[in-house]
Design a protein with these regions (language model features):
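Conserved NAD(P)H cofactor-binding loop of Rossmann-fold oxidoreductase domains
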Residues: 55-60
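Substrate-binding pocket helix/loop in short-chain dehydrogenase/reductase
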Residues: 63-64, 71-74, 163, 181
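Active-site loop-to-helix junction immediately N-terminal to the catalytic Tyr of the SDR YXXXK motif
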Residues: 67, 112-120, 132
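Active-site helix of classical SDR
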Residues: 87, 122
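Residue(s) in the substrate-gating loop at a strand-loop-helix junction
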Residues: 106
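Active-site-adjacent segment of SDR/Rossmann-fold oxidoreductases
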Residues: 111, 132-143
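C-terminal helical subdomain
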Residues: 147, 170-222
Length: 222
């Protein structure tokens, strides 16, 4: 049994990951602003840690001319700076356990999307941060660092917010916006967060399942 901390655990993919890991009898710590936590001002919530999962995320959509600096900062803070702050804060515990850092990235890291400058930039940052952290932490400390990059997820708060924001910014109907996005997915449907969570739970059953993934970003859905 491992001690695993999941950020963004109150809903969406983070909650699905929390539930899947708890079902595998891990000791799981949910870390979320809805629980009174702040990933930009981390407080140590445990005395041992085997796995840190950086899953907290936010997306704000708008045209460049309308996008405020405040919105930019919010997206970059949660999606990129939060990874830096949480990993740095929990590094001593991860060094002690020779643990694992798993970052939830996105296919948006390498796929430009209209009205999504901040989100794409933040996920691009999270992508290269994952590779850089692996370079710095694996050989020096024995810490495995890798990422999972899902496509659009089904039924999450972020996905619903994306649909609503696309309607407002593009002037489309909600039905057209949803179909437009589905047309871009090879299997023609959004990925249920539970499937991603089950895959992560399998990888984290034993470090031998994932230690050779250090420095890798695994796509989930296309």
């Amino acid at each position: 049994m491992s001690t695993i901390l999941v950020t963004g655990a109150a809903k969406g993919l983070g909650k699905a990951i929390y539930n899947a890991l708890e079902a595998d009898n891990h000791e799981v710590i949910g870390y979320d602003r809805n629980f009174g936590h702040d990933i930009l001002k981390p407080e140590i919530a445990c005395d041992k840690l085997d796995v840190l999962i950086n899953c907290a995320g936010v997306n704000l959509i708008d045209w460049l001319e309308n996008f405020t600096e405040e919105k930019w900062d919010e997206v970059m803070d949660v999606n990129a700076k939060g990874i830096f702050k949480m990993t740095q804060a929990y590094l001593p515990l991860l060094v002690e356990s020779k643990g694992t850092v798993l970052n939830i990235v996105s296919n948006a890291a390498h796929m430009p999307m209209t009205c999504s400058l901040a989100y794409n930039a933040s996920k691009g940052a999270a992508h290269i941060m994952t590779l850089q952290l692996a370079r710095e932490l694996t050989k020096k400390h024995g810490i495995t660092v890798f990422g999972i990059a899902p496509n659009k997820l089904k039924g999450t708060g972020m996905s619903d917010a994306i649909d609503d924001q696309v309607v407002k910014t593009r002037g489309w109907t909600k039905e057209y916006a949803q179909q437009y996005q589905l047309n871009g997915l090879l299997c023609g449907e959004e990925t249920p967060p539970e499937r991603v969570a089950e895959f992560i739970a399998f990888l984290l059953q034993d470090k031998d399942h994932h230690k050779h993934l250090t420095g890798c970003i695994l796509p989930y859905g296309a």
